[in-house]
Amino acid sequence: MPRTLSPAARIERSILSDFRKPLWRPFVRGIKQYKMIAPGDHIAVCISGGKDSMLLAKMMQLLQRHTDIPFETEFLVMDPGYNAENRQRIIDNAALMEIPIRIFDSSIFETTKIAERNPCYLCARMRRGFLYDRAQEMGCNKIALGHHFNDVVETTVMGMFYGAQLQAMLPKLHSRNFPGMELIRPMYCIHEEDICAWRDFNALHFIACACRLTEERDKSGDGIGNSKRAEIKQLLKTLRETNPETNCQGLFNQIHKKSTKRCQKHRMAPDTSFDRLHFSVQQVFAEIRIVWQLVDIWLPAPLDFG
């Protein structure tokens, strides 16, 4: 008689078997390629309650069991002011997936209401600082975030459109404000559509963006509101639907190449104000062909860059 698996065991098996190629392999490859984990590391896995961070937490658990590198983990949930329903869903999902979370309260959502123009930026910076601080108090030397392939591309395009610069999200970096602390992104090479497929395969229901400001804006019915990241995500989705030749992988490969060279040259890039690697003007022009392809600008004749 076959053994009945617990929900957590079924979820783990789906990662290691059904989604081994799109999830587990790029997860392990990214950690090895960027040397994210070293023996003796004490890593705070930061959980927001969304699909990305919950998958990250489960894969970090699995990695501890299947790797020869000894390291410790803490599963840190920072509650910035979630409503009761979202908080309870995080607790329920963590119990279902057998992830031993530790929840810490803050009032970040209330504090960021004062920033009328850029509340998302202020919120992100405050959340990052809180996570670094709490992780350090817990004896951790690293925090792990659930950013993935799509986040890397979207951040680059968002910087081009709204920051007038080509910049990239790094797979790992040092913190300037918290000496001895590092940030790693183990899901750097994983595609969001594969995360969604895994979630649906297991019939899991995670919270989306639980920001109070976002909830209020979405009542207007446009589904996007003033979120610049949501606008870029929709833009790239539309481009892929209307022009299958839109090449996000090509842009990611260029980011990967620049990031790898920077990490090798300086061992690891420092945490900047935007927590990203900034390219020089010369590099921007060198990659501008990819930019044209990505945003699908129709021109009467090809540009001659000499």
Role assignments for model-derived ranges:
Residues P2-M158, Y162, L166, L170, ...:
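ATP-dependent adenylation/nucleotidyltransferase module used to activate substrates
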Residues C120-C123, C140, C211, C263, ...:
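Disulfide-bonded cysteines in secreted/extracellular proteins and peptides
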Residues I255-K258, K265, V281, V291:
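Cationic, amphipathic, low-complexity alpha-helical segments enriched
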Residues E231-S259:
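An accessory alpha-helical subdomain
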